[in-house]
């Protein structure tokens, strides 16, 4: 990028006055020389090869063929096809175009860092923007103080830019307001010498404040930072740091001359420079602007902000709104003692949290002050951060920009999409080390850990006296930030609260107003980016079991207000969540989500063993107990285990002799609801007998019983052949086998095929020696209860199967089928209808 060029003498005054005012002018003269020593000092880089290729001129070659050849060589030096792949070369071309379209104030700064990819360039720009935001908060006015020496020592070098450095001067002949010029006069920046090759030096003449030329205030920043990018790369880290600090001083001095923000907010901080011998008073009626110069790469960010500043005619206290004043006081009221390890930052006086950026500190302060400056124009709801307001406004607009690529479901917040991904993957990365239970969300794990915390704290308080202080020995295993890749299946294992111990000591007394921080429960992670220290405090109710939210209707209490709101919908009958497909409403959103899967056919929960899918996670959990044989719900009375909680609840009624289901016909009470339905079928048969119709077949008609049970449930699964509907897909699958005559289950003993798994178990009882069902009349035993029922008809003379053609009765259905064949020739259609009704 550094080429041999002829440098012209840079003169700041017209040529006619050069001989007379050599002592008064700011002159920089560099003779023509070969800059190969700079290449030795700074070896060619990727940016150097790129600049050689871009700035190659046609006249540098002897002819068109040589020019084309040199361009090819320069392009190969830049793109390096022998080392880079096609994708890498494309990335370099995209990077070159990206750097070209950047704003002028960003281009030199980004090229200084020599990014090798577009991502690196974007990262540099984001860092610049963050630094701009931080400096915008920190730039303040130093009242009436301007340092005499504003240039960093040993920082200015020779400028390789072909553009001359111009400094506007006021000719001595101009009579306009000489007094004002003297008031606006500033000492010209001292340019220290830097040793060059062959003992050449960069000389600079300084202007005096009396009869010599005066420099405008607006150009102080340009003169102070007249560095070119190549020169900046020659400085070491200490010189760069010194230059940055002094650049801030220069800019603070410019603002002290009367420049204020557009909002007329007066920013006050301590003086930057100790040199307070010379003071200048800001002009009373002056309006100036700082000119732009794209060559000043290092301070292009500050110059952009200087242009947005205006001179305030009345230098004094500016009007501020309360929120600006609070934010300003929070920034300025920071002492050096509040920094840690010499770092520059801001520490919160309320909670002690430390922030490096002022913008983050201001947002944090709003948590303590309760300020919510961002208000929704639709509903008037306020938020303390703009991003929260943006998310809330999507509720009114219906915008859902985050879409799942698997099922197409859209979300308003990106975190909701991340949580939704775990539904498809079935992943539960948050595990409890106490009981081994896994959770798909971190909030669910926290709620689960609170239960362990309450149990152990209650156990501890029972053993100790009331005067004993309660404490928790916290221990948490470190988990790294690398374990937190969402796209790579999050693998976080949050450690559990461990070792509560017999004796408990609490580090601070708990009163009703004081809470237990979450870091007392979970500890602190090792990663700075995963900062859970801002998790809200957990109220004392987490450890005492307090339920402050009480229902006025039934008196039931809840820990969280959201649970109370959901519970109150039971009393009010409110069902705000409605299905757009069928119009059915629900009182909870999760119920609506589960119902909508009936229409969409979505089954996101898949069993990894057999591949069976389910709409609800709880159904998958119940199904997995089939493979594992686990029966987690055990009866404390007899020790019997059950796979479902509802089965255990029905079993417990046997011990408590609780009979909650009563028949309205005869008043008989039953333990289970299915027993009540079976009993009501008997009453139906008795009523039909009074009408002269024998309906004894209804005494054990499972079809009627199932129809009774499904009356209160949905029946979304319908058979395409006969139109019959079912509440569960498994019932529909079994029903299809009646049409297809499929028998997938086989007996292991005789290899006979059956249509249902339950029929297989009944069939295998034939080969067993045990006959548990015994007739009380003759003592004969049977393996199946249905066989016993058929046998008992011999003793009772019961004939429940009747032919509708001739009225003849039979004890068994097989006898009726044989009889019906005699009517086939006369009326085969009626015979088929009778067979269908019996089936």
Swiss-Prot record:
The record's annotation in SMART domains points to: KRAB, SCAN, ZnF_C2H2
Record cross-link Glycyl lysine isopeptide (Lys-Gly) (interchain with G-Cter in SUMO2), residues:
216, 248, 270, 303, 317, 509, 513, 709, 785
- Domain SCAN box, by residue range, is 51-132
Q: Where is the composition biased (Polar residues)?
A: 158-173
Highest taxon listed in the record's lineage: Eukaryota
KW Ubl conjugation (keyword) present: yes
Q: Which residues form a coiled coil?
A: none
Q: Indicate where this protein resides in the cell.
A: Nucleus
Q: Which SUPFAM superfamilies match?
A: beta-beta-alpha zinc fingers, KRAB domain (Kruppel-associated box), Retrovirus capsid dimerization domain-like
Q: Where are the zinc fingers (C2H2-type)?
A: 346-368, 374-396, 402-424, 430-452, 549-571, 577-599, 605-627, 633-655, 661-683, 717-739, 745-763, 773-795, 801-823
Q: Which GO terms describe its biological process?
A: regulation of transcription by RNA polymerase II
Which Pfam family is one of this chain's hits? KRAB
Gene3D superfamilies named in the record:
6.10.140.140, Classic Zinc Finger, DNA breaking-rejoining enzymes
Q: Which GO terms describe its cellular component?
A: nucleus
Q: Where is the KRAB domain?
A: 218-291
- Tell me, what is one Gene Ontology molecular-function annotation carried by this entry? RNA polymerase II cis-regulatory region sequence-specific DNA binding
The annotated region (Disordered) lies at 151-175
Q: Sorted alphabetically, which keywords does the UniProt record give? A: DNA-binding, Isopeptide bond, Metal-binding, Nucleus, Phosphoprotein, Repeat, Transcription, Transcription regulation, Ubl conjugation, Zinc, Zinc-finger
Query: Which of the residues bear the PTM Phosphoserine?
Result: 335
Tell me the function of this protein. Answer: May be involved in transcriptional regulation.
Family note: Belongs to the krueppel C2H2-type zinc-finger protein family.
Name of the featured protein: Zinc finger protein with KRAB and SCAN domains 5
**What is the organism of origin for this protein?**
Pan troglodytes
Q: What is the lineage of its organism?
A: Eukaryota, Metazoa, Chordata, Craniata, Vertebrata
């Amino acid at each position: 990028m550094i080429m041999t060029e002829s440098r012209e003498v840079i003169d700041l005054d017209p040529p006619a006055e050069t001989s007379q005012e050599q002592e008064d002018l700011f002159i920089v003269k560099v003779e023509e020389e070969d800059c190969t020593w700079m290449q030795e000092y700074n070896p060619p880089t990727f940016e150097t090869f790129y600049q050689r290729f871009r700035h190659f001129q046609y006249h540098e070659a002897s002819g068109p063929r040589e020019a084309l050849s040199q361009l090819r060589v320069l392009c190969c030096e830049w793109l390096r096809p022998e080392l880079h792949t096609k994708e890498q070369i494309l990335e370099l071309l995209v990077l070159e175009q990206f750097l070209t379209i950047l704003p002028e104030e960003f281009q030199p700064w980004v090229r200084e860092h020599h990014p090798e990819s577009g991502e690196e360039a974007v990262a540099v720009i984001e860092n610049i923007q963050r630094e701009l935001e931080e400096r915008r908060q920190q730039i303040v006015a130093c009242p009436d103080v301007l340092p005499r020496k504003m240039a960093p020592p040993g920082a200015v070098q020779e400028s390789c830019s072909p553009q001359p450095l111009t400094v506007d001067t006021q000719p001595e002949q101009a009579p306009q307001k000489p007094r004002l010029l003297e008031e606006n006069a500033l000492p010209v920046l001292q340019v220290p010498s830097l040793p060059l090759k062959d003992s050449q030096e960069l000389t600079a003449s300084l202007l005096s404040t009396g009869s010599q030329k005066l420099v405008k205030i607006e150009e102080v920043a340009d003169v102070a930072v007249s560095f070119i990018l190549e020169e900046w790369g020659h400085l070491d880290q200490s010189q760069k740091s010194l230059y940055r600090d002094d650049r801030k001083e220069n800019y603070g001095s410019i603002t002290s001359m009367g420049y204020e923000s557009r909002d007329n907010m007066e920013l006050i901080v301590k003086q930057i420079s100790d040199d307070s011998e010379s003071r200048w008073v800001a002009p009373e009626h002056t309006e100036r602007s700082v000119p732009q110069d794209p060559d000043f790469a290092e301070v292009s960010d500050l110059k952009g902000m200087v242009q947005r500043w205006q001179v305030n005619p009345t230098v004094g206290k500016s009007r501020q709104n309360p929120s600006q004043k609070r934010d300003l006081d929070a920034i300025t009221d920071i002492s050096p003692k509040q920094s840690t390890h010499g770092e520059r930052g801001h520490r919160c006086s309320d909670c002690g949290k430390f922030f490096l950026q002022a913008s983050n500190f201001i947002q944090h302060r709003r948590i303590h002050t309760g300020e919510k400056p961002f208000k929704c124009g639709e509903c008037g709801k306020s938020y303390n951060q703009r991003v929260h307001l943006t998310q809330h406004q999507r509720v009114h607009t219906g915008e859902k920009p985050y879409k799942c690529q698997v099922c197409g479901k859209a979300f308003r917040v990106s975190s909701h999409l991340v949580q939704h991904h775990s539904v498809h993957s079935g992943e539960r990365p948050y595990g409890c080390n106490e009981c081994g239970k896994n959770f798909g969300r971190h909030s669910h794990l926290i709620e689960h850990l609170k239960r362990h915390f309450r149990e152990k704290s209650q156990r501890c308080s029972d053993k100790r006296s009331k005067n004993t202080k309660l404490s928790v020995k916290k221990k948490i295993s470190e988990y790294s930030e690398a374990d937190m890749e969402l796209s790579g299946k999050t693998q976080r294992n949050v450690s559990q609260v461990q070792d509560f111990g017999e004796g408990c000591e609490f580090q601070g007394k708990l009163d009703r107003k004081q809470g237990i921080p979450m870091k007392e429960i979970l500890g602190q992670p090792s990663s700075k980016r995963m900062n859970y220290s801002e998790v809200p405090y957990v109220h004392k109710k987490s450890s005492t079991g307090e339920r402050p939210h009480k229902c006025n209707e039934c008196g039931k209490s809840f820990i969280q207000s959201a649970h109370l709101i959901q519970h109150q919908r039971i009393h009010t009958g409110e069902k705000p969540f409605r299905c757009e497909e069928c119009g059915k409403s629900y009182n909870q959103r999760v119920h609506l989500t589960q119902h909508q899967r009936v229409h969409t056919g979505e089954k996101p929960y898949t069993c990894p063993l057999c591949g069976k899918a389910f709409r609800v996670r709880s159904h998958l959990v119940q199904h997995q107990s089939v493979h594992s044989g686990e029966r987690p719900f055990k009866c404390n009375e007899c020790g019997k285990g059950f796979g479902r909680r509802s089965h255990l609840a029905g079993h417990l009624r046997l011990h408590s002799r609780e009979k909650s289901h009563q028949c309205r016909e005869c008043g008989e009470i039953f333990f289970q609801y299915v027993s009540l339905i079976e009993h009501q079928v008997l009453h139906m048969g008795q009523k039909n007998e009074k009408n002269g119709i024998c309906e004894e077949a209804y005494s054990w008609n499972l079809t009627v019983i199932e129809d009774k049970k499904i009356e209160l449930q949905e029946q979304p699964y319908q058979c395409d052949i006969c139109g019959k509907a079912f509440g569960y897909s498994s019932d529909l699958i079994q029903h299809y086998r009646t049409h297809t005559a499929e028998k997938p289950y086989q007996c292991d003993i005789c290899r006979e095929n059956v249509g249902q798994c339950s029929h297989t178990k009944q069939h295998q009882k034939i080969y067993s020696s045990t006959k548990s069902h015994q007739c009380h009349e003759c003592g004969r035993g049977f393996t199946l209860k249905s066989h016993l029922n058929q046998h008992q008809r011999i003793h009772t003379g019961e004939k429940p199967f009747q032919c509708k053609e001739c009225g003849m009765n039979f004890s068994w259905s097989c006898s009726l089928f044989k009889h019906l064949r005699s009517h086939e020739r006369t009326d085969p259609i009626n015979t088929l209808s009778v067979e269908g009704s019996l089936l």
